[in-house]
Design a protein with these regions (language model features):
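Helix-rich, typically C-terminal accessory recognition domains appended to large enzymatic cores
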Residues: 86, 147, 151-165, 421-450, ...
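Glycine-rich (often Gly-Gly/Gly-Pro-rich) flexible segments and glycine-rich loop motifs
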Residues: 183, 441-505, 599-647
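NTP-handling and nucleic-acid-processing catalytic cores
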Residues: 8-20, 68, 139-371, 471-492, ...
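Residue patterns forming the tRNA-binding/recognition surfaces of aminoacyl-tRNA synthetases
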Residues: 4, 9, 17-18, 22-26, ...
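Conserved phosphate/anionic-ligand binding catalytic regions in large, soluble enzymes, centered on
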Residues: 251-273, 430, 436-443, 509-524, ...
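Long, charged, mostly alpha-helical binding arms that flank functional sites
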Residues: 6-10, 233-238, 371-374, 379-411, ...
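Conserved oxyanion/phosphate-binding beta-strand-loop segments in alpha/beta enzyme cores
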Residues: 2-44, 73-82, 105-116, 217, ...
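N-terminal catalytic cores of NTP/NDP-binding nucleotidyl/phosphoryl-transfer enzymes
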Residues: 32-101, 130-145, 255-256, 322-358, ...
Length: 886
């Protein structure tokens, strides 16, 4: 045995790069496509935007995915584990404005730096599959797919009110507006009318909803619920309201409450609804136009939000209630949006809270048409009644239960040709036009004769110009002097018209960057950056896509539930219909990892705003329980407040640089810390003591293994049955099998690496060199090394090699356990007589029933404890306890 002074020092800075170089040279993490699918496994983490530096959220996400990939390789799977870059997007243009860097240069310099960081972490990626979405090859293939979508009728252009980010000067999808503000910048979003390119995601609404049932059990319930809510399927009726004095105009409403039709006292309409131009009288024109301008200053999401003030404007027009024939006023309302539903809403103040508040505000009548069972008709006065009840004041439907009346009134409307039963969706088509430079150009042209026409596939790709001026004001491509009218070869852009070639102009909008992330996972299956054709010249190779998809495990944040994840599901179905794949769902299992959180450090400014500090700017003292006793700024020695634990963010400066941790402790320590504290789906709270604890554990494993290496190298690891062992050897032999089972169960069921790591720590505590035989000690150490392999691969590989194994851990495989060797052959029984423990005995586990009772009563210690007293009743729980009444 080596003395502590002779043990090789644990030096991650030397060990880790050496193993990374060996893995890379051996191509250990590349994959073949000729392995049967049942022995293949595709694990993918959501690829990053190349912002320039990894943060701790990245480290946790990728550590989870990499540990799964390494575990599955050890289980004999061919694992596809790729990495790429979601590299189009606004920050590159912001860098051009702030730093004078070209977006392409800035992006690819960041990619190079972050690739190096990922490699230094030892993540086992198939780097031959790497691509960036801004690579010409990927962008060209995406344009190819886009034209296929055009041909299938899934792309169209329309002029409509859009969400306009005042901070980004571009259009946002509905999903990118949060509380009336831009999801990225937090700046206000207003309504603006622009021509937009859209994808018909609504064509797949029904399949997107039904497909969620297939994902049950593989996806988090919270994500499934968010998608169901976003799709928003509603069954109800469309009802036609004639406009008084305008026999050629009909306003159609959608409602899920046709039973309340007789109680309609006004109708609300979107201020931007096209019909208003025809039906608003001159007396109300100025008032309506002013209201329309006011409403345009807010986003659709803000207008429809529960907390927004509900405002209205009388239009001077009236509509006819098709059930009663009564004229009711038409109000323009800020909470009604033209492209949501029909843009017209019937209002029943007696039975809808929002309508009641609106009616109270504007002095509109309230007519009750549903009464609680047992109550008659009458003015309630205390508010709206929204529960089921009995129809009243509704003509032929009086006395009918309101739920039954829904169908009856709908049928009456259909027979009267005044309405119809319909299904509607909250989901809207996906507007993909963005007025930015750093995105994939939309491959369309405009010419006098042809009008709007798709670019021919043989003329792809439409490439971005390098000589572009970016100032944050408007669309850089639209302002470029020549790009829109110049062909790829530098000649004037021409298209083939009916009478011959004619001049054309390119579309200057680029695609929403969610386009790129909607199919990248499929491209990884057939991409190879070592080949001239990049793996395949077509956008996708169907055979290889179908071999690998769906992704077996997809790891990423829950914040993408109704953005990226919904778009990716839609895109996969569309790709299937285009013949690129036979797969309809992209991700079999989804793991939404928790955030990395940290306490905030700040001072309150005189203006009430918080001034945040980075952790290394503050001296914090804690007591034995980790509670803060003092916090002062290093710069001035003045107190700093310690705030609540929140997600790490640059804005609150509660961040830690992963690179600094790697330099100080090594990649394995970082990986172990983010995996060890809690299950992967829960938030992990950053703790420097926790990181130090992870490092201490790795050093302890290192010292144990290296310290016993000389003693154990010539001794085979024990591989027999534990029944052949005695004492501490037998106990540890059973512990080895129990630990393997515990780790295997944890990783197979929930990828609970925290449970597996805890089990490894327990096993390490049992490996006492002074108490164990060399064979059992070696078996314990080597089992520990193999179990830690997926989580801390560098240390594990180094120690595995140190014990004389020429093959690596992947070839060695995951250790197996024998359930029969986990429990001892004999069970220990405390024997209670009259409720007090009088003896402790051991008996074979095979004994049950009368044989077990007979063995208990015949045991010498029990006989002595009974002292001749007869047993009136014996209660024996096999393997647990004995209770005797005398």
């Amino acid at each position: 045995m080596s003395s502590p002074a002779e043990i090789i020092e644990y030096t991650p800075a030397v060990i880790e790069p050496a193993w990374q170089a060996r893995w890379d040279a051996a191509g250990l993490h590349e994959v073949r496509d000729d392995v049967p699918r049942e022995k293949c496994y595709y694990v993918l983490e959501m690829f990053p935007y190349p912002s320039g530096k990894l943060h701790m959220g990245h480290v946790r996400n990728y550590s989870i995915g990499d540990a799964v990939a390494r575990y599955k390789r050890m289980r004999g799977f061919q694992v596809l584990h790729p990495m790429g870059w979601d590299s189009f997007g606004l920050p590159a243009e912001q860098a051009a404005i702030e730093r004078g860097a070209h977006p392409r240069t800035w992006t690819y310099e960041n990619i190079a730096h972050m690739r190096g960081q990922l490699q230094r972490m030892g993540f086992s990626y198939a780097w031959s599959r790497e691509f960036a979405c801004s690579d010409p090859g990927y962008a060209a293939r995406e344009q190819d797919i886009f034209l296929d979508l055009v041909e299938r009728g899934l792309v169209y252009r329309k002029s409509s009110l859009v969400n306009w980010s005042t901070g980004l000067n571009c259009v946002l999808a509905n999903e990118q507006v949060v509380d009336g503000k831009c999801w990225r910048t937090g700046t206000p979003v207003i309504q603006k009318e622009l021509p937009q390119w859209c994808l018909r995601i609504t064509s797949y609404a029904d399949e997107l909803l039904k497909g969620l049932d297939q994902l049950q059990g593989g996806w988090p319930d919270a994500v499934l619920a968010q998608q169901r809510n976003w799709l928003g399927r509603s069954e109800g009726a469309e009802i036609d309201f004639a406009v008084d004095g305008h026999p050629d105009v009909v306003l159609t409403v959608f409602t899920t409450r046709p039973d309340t039709l007789f109680g309609v006292t006004f109708v609300s309409i979107a201020p931007e609804h096209a019909a208003l131009e025809r039906i608003v009288p001159a007396s109300h024109r100025a008032q309506v136009d002013a209201f329309k301008a006011e409403v345009r200053a807010t986003s659709a999401q803000e207008r429809m939000g529960d907390t927004a003030e509900k405002k209205g404007c009388p239009t001077g027009a009236f509509v006819i209630n098709p059930a009663t024939g009564a004229k009711v006023p038409l109000y323009a309302a800020n909470f009604v949006v033209a492209d949501y539903g029909t843009g017209v809403v019937m209002a029943v103040p007696a039975h809808d809270d929002r309508d009641f508040a609106f009616a109270q505000k504007y002095g509109l009548p309230v007519v009750e048409v549903i009464a609680p069972a047992g109550e008659g008709r009458g003015e309630r006065g205390e508010g709206s009644y929204t529960d089921p009840g009995v129809m009243t004041g509704s003509g032929q439907f009086d006395g009918m239960p309101s739920e039954q009346a829904k169908g009856a009134i709908t049928a009456w409307l259909e027979s009267s040709k005044k309405g119809r039963k319909v299904v509607t969706w909250r989901l809207r088509d996906w507007g993909i036009s963005r007025q930015r430079y750093w995105g994939n150009p939309i491959p369309f042209t405009y010419s006098d004769t042809l009008g709007i026409a798709p670019v021919r596939k043989q003329d792809l790709p439409v490439a971005l110009p390098m000589d572009v001026a970016i100032d944050g004001k408007g669309n850089p491509l639209e302002k470029h002097p020549t790009w829109a009218v110049t062909a790829n070869d530098g000649s004037p852009l021409m298209v083939k018209g009916p009478a011959g070639p004619e001049k054309a102009r390119r579309e200057t909008d680029t695609m929403d960057t969610f386009m790129e992330s909607s199919w990248y996972f499929a491209r990884f299956t057939c991409h190879d950056n070592r080949r001239d054709d990049l793996g395949c010249a077509a956008p996708l190779d169907k055979a290889r896509v179908d071999h690998w998809l769906p992704v077996d495990l997809y790891v990423g944040g829950i914040e993408h539930a109704v953005l990226h994840l919904l778009y990716a599901r839609f895109f996969t179905k569309a790709l299937s219909d285009l013949g690129y794949t036979g797969v309809r769902e992209p991700f079999k299992r989804l793991l939404c990892q928790g955030m990395v959180c940290m306490e905030t450090l700040y001072r309150e400014g005189a203006d009430g705003k918080k001034q945040y500090f980075y952790p290394d700017e503050v001296e914090v003292e804690r007591d034995a329980k980790g509670r803060v006793t003092s916090a002062v700024a290093k710069a001035d020695g003045q107190p700093v407040l310690v705030g609540r634990v929140e997600k790490m963010s640059k804005s609150k400066r509660n961040t830690v640089d992963p690179q600094a941790l790697v330099d100080l402790y090594g990649a394995d320590t970082c990986r172990l810390f983010v995996l060890s504290n809690v299950p992967p789906e829960l938030d992990v709270v950053w703790s420097e003591d926790g990181v130090k604890g992870s490092h201490r554990f790795l050093k302890r494993v290192w010292v144990l293994a290296q310290g016993q290496r000389e003693r154990l190298l010539g001794v085979p690891a024990f591989a027999g049955h534990v029944r052949d062992l005695t004492g501490a050897d037998q106990a540890v032999g059973r512990k080895i099998h129990a630990t393997i089972k515990r780790c295997t169960d944890a990783l197979e069921k929930d990828f609970a690496f925290n449970t597996a790591i805890a089990a490894c720590m327990e096993l390490s505590n049992e490996l006492d060199p002074a108490a164990l035989s060399p064979a059992v000690l070696r078996a314990g150490i080597e089992t520990l090394i193999r179990l830690l392999g997926p989580m801390v691969p560098h240390l594990a590989e180094e120690l595995w090699a140190a014990y004389g194994h020429a093959e690596g851990l992947t070839a060695a495989g995951w250790p197996a356990y024998d359930p029969a060797q986990i429990e001892a052959d004999e069970a220990d029984y405390p024997v209670q007589i009259q409720g007090k423990v009088r003896a402790k005995i051991s008996l074979p586990r095979t004994l049950t029933g009368p044989a077990l009772e007979a063995a208990v009563l015949a045991h010498p210690e029990v006989v002595a404890a009974l002292a001749g007293k007869p047993v009136k009743k014996a209660i024996i729980v096999p393997g647990k306890i004995v209770n005797l009444d005398v």
